[in-house]
């Protein structure tokens, strides 16, 4: 082996070897235990960023470790290739999305290979290819036939100048990102999949996901939002209309003083027809997009409709108000308002001087003071007629039962979860396989006409979708009847909801999935991705798996057994203020910094002399120009160093602070491992280790070696605390570096230790370990070498170091045989002169002994 560690010489050769040998290519093998490790597939944006590197390094470490345990390991990769950014980039670069996407895929694929990730490249998927989305379209038509798909009008962002639908991220301060025209809300027909039919399953099955982060499961529970309550029907004065509301607090029903309805509710629209002021208010509400998350903090606005509902139990007339905080697409688009016991209702009632009626007593049994705020706690009912004196639960049930008995109420379980709107009015996505025939009938595209192919050779004008702009594209026939194809495309979450299953059989042409392959590999054993996907992607991912199961395509209930959500990668951020007061962000690579003795940044300038403001550590992003290019780091230090730093600098699920000094430290460590191996091999062949004739010093070193193997095995396999595993190997390396190399046994022990160290580091730094394994004479390639097994006998200690205290103060340390009794330890302590002087002529009143660790003598 060469004397110096040169990653540039090693890494290309090793990667070529893997490619030629097809090391990571796998097929189903019933004789071996399978392990499917999957990292969330990347969007081909053009360049890998450090977040990608962290995600894929974690996945690769787990995959290589599991392979060393003798398992049949599948680790695939692909590209989530549809989506809006490609359209923007195509317009900007005067090209079409397809060539831009395919160029990016090629570039990023090479970057992944440079980092040494062990993927089965034969299974590579690009979701924009017809051979992939063909099966998605086919499955959608099957869902339609099962009644799981429907079309309804839903609000979108509409630019009246460009006559196009805008994604939320294309609306800047209420205006179109391209032409700055004020954006309107427009109702258009869209396709939905009934995820709500699976709400109960999605909720209950979270309890089976024992190896998913609790945080993710809690977020999903909240998103599904199961509640038990009552649907209540109000009559409307002088109208045939009925008004339906849902409440989770029927115990407060006697405190309803008004009803609030959404601007788009039929009663609002009916009243607005003869009330111009109300019509203006309704228009304002409907053109203001409000996310549910903003409801709590936004200003509550409303206007009386002039209509009244009748309280089903008291007969009171309740004013009906149109309000901006009621969403038409959530529940019934109407809420009963109990301002005495709901903060939002109280705020609205106070603003518009509406009655506030208390019906729940305070905790001390007194009437609540509602002058400053609502009392939202549950308690005893009063001011509620026949229900006075009932506690919350009894009041809930009594009022619910009464409403049901009168035929104006129905107990109901409700979900916050909404059906999944899968229509996107964009071009770069999979066409939705539906056709509207001449007579207006809507039918699915026949199977023999699938896939509905998206044309890739198009001209982007930045305004309309090429398939919407081309009337010829939509023309088709079904069973000889002319019709028009749907020109909307699928939400890209569709593609990423089932890709994991297609990886099991990417070339399979006889169906969506090959059942034998899918059921061999699935469920995924380990899924790795960011916490930001906790709700959307991970919910659809779970939902789709249940759809596949119910279609007979897979036989498991959940797609992934274990989930690891890696933390973000942070870096220093610097800026200076430009001439117009704007912040100009400077890359940390271009910042020249001064630090104090604690390593804190006290001054920074850029190459042009601008004094920089240090904005602290923040997530690597284009907006703050603080991303570090992985390729630059790989060229400078080697892929193994970058991988090692990524896994060592922080626990996998925590944020990682990028520090180049830490990267340099990782590089120095690999150089030390290389140097120790070089010095060892330079001395020639090694004789076998004779365990029976080891000295105490050699036994101690071998004990440390096998304790390290045991710890690293547990840290990597069970605990997934990769940073502590690396720290343990580093600690062992320090001991090996100091170990004598005088005798044959010393060298034989060093050989055992280095072969173990190289295997423990292999999942993290595979290239250098591949070379070191060869240099050390390891059997075969390290890629097929088994994980080291800790020798239980080696870890048994012949002796123990016992701390001796007198009255709780440490007075000495003694070495005793591992099997020494308490009496023997006391006798040995009495012989220790540092201890003996504190016992001279004094009576020992009490002895506290922790076997093999501590002896405390209480004297006096």
Curated annotation (Swiss-Prot):
As annotated in the record, motif 'KMSKS' region runs over: 619-623
Where is it mostly found? cytoplasm
Q: Which reaction does it catalyse?
A: tRNA(Leu) + L-leucine + ATP = L-leucyl-tRNA(Leu) + AMP + diphosphate
Compartmental location: Cytoplasm
User: For binding ATP, which residues are annotated in this chain's numbering?
Assistant: 622
Q: Which Gene3D superfamilies match?
A: 2.20.28.290, 3.10.20.590, HUPs (3.40.50.620), Isoleucyl-tRNA Synthetase, Domain 1 (1.10.730.10), Valyl/Leucyl/Isoleucyl-tRNA synthetase, editing domain (3.90.740.10)
Question: What keywords would UniProt list here?
Answer: Aminoacyl-tRNA synthetase, ATP-binding, Cytoplasm, Ligase, Nucleotide-binding, Protein biosynthesis
UniProt keyword annotation of Mitochondrion present? no
| One annotated GO molecular function | leucine-tRNA ligase activity
Q: Does the keyword Ligase apply?
A: yes
Query: Membrane spanning segments where?
Result: none
Q: Which SUPFAM superfamilies match?
A: Anticodon-binding domain of a subclass of class I aminoacyl-tRNA synthetases, Nucleotidylyl transferase, ValRS/IleRS/LeuRS editing domain
GO annotations under biological process?
A: leucyl-tRNA aminoacylation
| Cellular compartments per GO CC | cytosol
**InterPro entries under this entry?**
aa-tRNA-synth_I_CS (IPR001412), aa-tRNA-synth_Ia (IPR002300), Leu-tRNA-ligase (IPR002302), Leu_tRNA-synth_edit (IPR025709), M/V/L/I-tRNA-synth_anticd-bd (IPR013155), Methionyl/Leucyl_tRNA_Synth (IPR015413), Rossmann-like_a/b/a_fold (IPR014729), tRNAsynth_Ia_anticodon-bd (IPR009080)
Motif 'HIGH' region, residue numbers: 42-52
Record's family? Belongs to the class-I aminoacyl-tRNA synthetase family.
Protein name as it appears in the record: Leucine--tRNA ligase
Name its species: Yersinia pestis bv. Antiqua (strain Angola)
């Amino acid at each position: 082996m060469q004397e110096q560690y040169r990653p540039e010489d090693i890494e290309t050769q090793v990667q070529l070897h893997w490619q030629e040998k097809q090391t990571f290519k796998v097929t189903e093998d019933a004789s071996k235990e399978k392990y499917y490790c999957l990292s969330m597939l990347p969007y081909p944006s053009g360049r890998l960023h450090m977040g990608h590197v962290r995600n894929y390094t974690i996945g690769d470490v787990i995959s290589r470790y599991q392979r060393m345990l003798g398992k049949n390991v599948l680790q695939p990769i692909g590209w989530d290739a549809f989506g809006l950014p490609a359209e923007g980039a195509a317009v900007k670069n005067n090209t079409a999305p397809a060539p831009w996407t395919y160029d990016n895929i090629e570039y990023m694929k090479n970057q992944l290979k440079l980092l040494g990730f062990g993927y089965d490249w034969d299974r590579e998927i690009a979701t924009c290819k017809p051979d992939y989305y063909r099966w998605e379209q086919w499955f959608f038509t099957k869902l339609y036939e099962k009644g799981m798909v429907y079309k309804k009008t839903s609000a979108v962002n509409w630019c009246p100048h460009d006559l196009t639908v805008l994604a939320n991220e294309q609306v800047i301060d209420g205006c179109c990102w391209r032409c700055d025209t004020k954006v309107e809300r427009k109702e258009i027909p869209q396709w939905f999949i009934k995820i709500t039919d699976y709400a109960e399953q999605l909720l209950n099955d979270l309890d089976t996901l024992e190896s998913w982060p609790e945080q993710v499961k809690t977020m999903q529970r909240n998103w599904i939002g199961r509640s038990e309550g009552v649907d209540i029907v109000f009559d409307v004065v002088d109208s045939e209309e009925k008004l339906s509301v849902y409440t989770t607090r029927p115990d407060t029903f006697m405190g309803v003083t008004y009803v609030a309805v959404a601007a788009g509710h039929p009663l609002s629209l009916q009243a607005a027809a003869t009330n111009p002021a109300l019509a203006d208010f309704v228009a304002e509400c409907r053109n203001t997009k409000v996310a549910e998350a903003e409801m709590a903090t936004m200003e509550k606005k409303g206007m009386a409709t002039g209509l009244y509902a009748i309280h089903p139990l008291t007969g009171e007339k309740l004013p009906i108000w149109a309000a901006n905080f009621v969403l038409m697409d959530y529940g019934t688009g109407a809420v009963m308002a109990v301002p005495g016991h709901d903060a939002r209702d109280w705020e609205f009632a106070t603003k518009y001087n509406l009655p506030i009626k208390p019906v729940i007593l305070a905790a001390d049994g007194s009437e609540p003071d509602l002058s400053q705020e609502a009392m939202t706690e549950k308690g005893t009912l009063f001011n509620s007629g026949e229900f006075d004196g009932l506690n919350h639960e009894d009041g809930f049930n009594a009022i619910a039962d009464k409403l049901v008995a009168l035929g104006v109420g129905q107990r109901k379980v409700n979900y916050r979860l909404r059906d999944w709107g899968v229509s996107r009015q964009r071009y770069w996505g999979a066409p939705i396989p539906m056709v509207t025939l001449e007579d207006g009938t809507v039918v699915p595209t026949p199977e023999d006409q699938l896939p509905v192919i998206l044309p890739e050779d198009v001209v982007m004008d930045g305004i309309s979708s090429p398939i919407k702009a081309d009337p010829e594209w939509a023309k088709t026939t079904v069973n000889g009847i002319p019709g028009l194809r749907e020109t909307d495309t699928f939400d890209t979450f569709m593609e990423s909801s089932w890709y994991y299953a297609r990886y099991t059989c990417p070339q399979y042409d006889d169906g969506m999935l090959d059942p034998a392959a899918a059921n061999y590999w699935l469920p995924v054993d380990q899924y790795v991705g960011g916490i930001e996907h906790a709700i959307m992607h991970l919910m659809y991912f779970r939902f789709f798996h249940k759809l596949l199961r119910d279609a007979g395509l897979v036989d498991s209930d959940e797609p992934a057994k274990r989930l690891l959500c890696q933390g973000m990668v942070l870096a220093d951020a610097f800026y200076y203020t430009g001439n117009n007061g704007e912040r100009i962000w400077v890359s940390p690579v271009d910042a020249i910094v001064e630090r104090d003795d604690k390593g804190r940044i006290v001054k920074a300038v850029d190459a042009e002399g601008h004094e920089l403001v240090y904005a602290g550590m923040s997530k690597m992003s284009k907006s703050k120009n603080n991303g570090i290019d992985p390729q630059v780091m790989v060229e400078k230090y080697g892929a193994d160093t970058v991988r090692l730093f990524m896994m060592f600098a922080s626990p996998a699920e925590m944020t990682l602070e990028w520090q180049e000094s830490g990267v340099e430290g990782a590089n120095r460590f690999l150089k030390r491992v290389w140097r120790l191996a070089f010095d060892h091999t330079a001395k020639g062949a090694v004789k076998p280790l004779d365990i029976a004739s080891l000295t105490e010093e050699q036994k101690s070193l071998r004990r440390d070696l096998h304790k390290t193997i045991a710890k690293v095995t547990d840290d990597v396999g069970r605990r997934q605390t990769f940073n502590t595993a690396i720290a343990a190997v580093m600690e062992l390396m320090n001991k090996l570096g100091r170990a004598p190399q005088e005798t044959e046994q010393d060298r034989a022990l060093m050989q055992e230790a280095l072969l173990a160290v190289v295997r423990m580091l292999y999942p993290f730094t595979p290239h250098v370990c591949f070379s070191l394994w060869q240099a050390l004479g390891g059997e075969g390639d390290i890629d097929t070498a088994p994980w080291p097994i800790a020798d239980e006998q080696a870890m048994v200690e012949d002796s123990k170091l016992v701390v001796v205290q007198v009255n709780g103060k440490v007075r000495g340390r003694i070495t005793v045989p591992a099997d020494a009794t308490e009496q023997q330890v006391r006798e040995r302590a009495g012989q220790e002169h540092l201890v003996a002087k504190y016992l001279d002529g004094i009576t020992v009143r009490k002895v506290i002994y922790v076997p093999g660790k501590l002896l405390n003598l209480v004297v006096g």
